[in-house]
């Protein structure tokens, strides 16, 4: 089946949408009116039907992370237990990892090929505010390859993986934004504004890198510490 890189398509979509959002006329801008005139013609996005993941993990095996020790307690770190469930699911050929309703604190999780992490309604993953719970590895930050903390959810060098459901991924990123703005004040005073973006290490929400047929569906992603969903290197999809 012919494949395409969705990264250039994202850029094309952004260009089309920007072009469609016409700026107000001088008359409109001058009277501070909320009337923006005629609605601009919407761009043709029919091409979007031909891109995206070609499949979701199909194995019907369901593993509960609670059986591996995950605890619905926001004060208890359940990273290891949830990761064990994901890894075990991948070993047996893939399937779905679920959690009982509740709040689970977690550090970096790595979704494997063939695995669907299902966040059902009533399930909330609370990202740990400690940067030490996110191991560092080589990644791309604002166009530069460097060592950076893992995201809360990572899908790297994998195929046919997904995160789905009606639950919530709360990244609780305020601690990282507070750190950034404090460092930025110091760096700006030294004329080094641009460097703070690389020196202030923060945790991203979701990282997808060098992977294919990845699905993110249904769940709520909120309060990220640095970027919501990041795609790096072309992601191959139909």
Give a label for each model feature:
Residues 2-8, 16, 21-98, 103-116, ...:
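Extracellular "leader-to-stem" segments immediately downstream of a signal peptide or signal-anchor
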Residues 217-221, 228:
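Active-site pocket-lining segments that scaffold enzyme catalytic pockets across diverse folds
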Residues 230, 234, 238:
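Phosphate-binding glycine-rich loops and their immediate beta-loop-alpha structural context
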């Amino acid at each position: 089946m012919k494949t395409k890189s969705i990264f250039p398509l994202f850029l094309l979509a952004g260009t089309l949408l920007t072009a469609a959002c016409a700026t107000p006329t001088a008359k409109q801008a001058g009277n501070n009116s909320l009337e923006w005139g005629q609605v601009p013609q919407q761009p043709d996005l029919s091409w979007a039907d031909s891109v995206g993941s070609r499949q979701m993990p199909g194995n019907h095996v369901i593993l509960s992370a609670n059986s591996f020790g995950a605890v619905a307690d926001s004060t208890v770190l359940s990273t290891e237990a949830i990761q064990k469930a994901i890894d075990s699911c991948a070993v047996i050929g893939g399937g779905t990892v679920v959690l009982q309703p509740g709040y689970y604190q977690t550090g970096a999780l790595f979704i494997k090929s063939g695995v669907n992490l299902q966040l059902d309604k009533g399930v909330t993953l609370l990202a740990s505010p400690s940067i030490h719970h996110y191991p560092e590895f080589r990644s791309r930050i604002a166009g530069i390859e460097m060592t950076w903390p893992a995201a809360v959810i990572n899908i790297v060098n994998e195929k046919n993986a997904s995160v789905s459901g009606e639950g919530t991924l709360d990244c609780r990123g305020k601690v990282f934004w507070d750190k950034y703005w404090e460092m930025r004040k110091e760096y700006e005073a030294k004329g080094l504004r641009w460097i703070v973006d690389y020196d202030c290490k923060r945790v991203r929400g979701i990282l997808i890198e060098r992977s294919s047929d990845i699905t993110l569906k249904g769940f709520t992603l909120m309060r990220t510490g640095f970027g919501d969903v990041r795609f790096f290197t072309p992601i191959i999809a139909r």
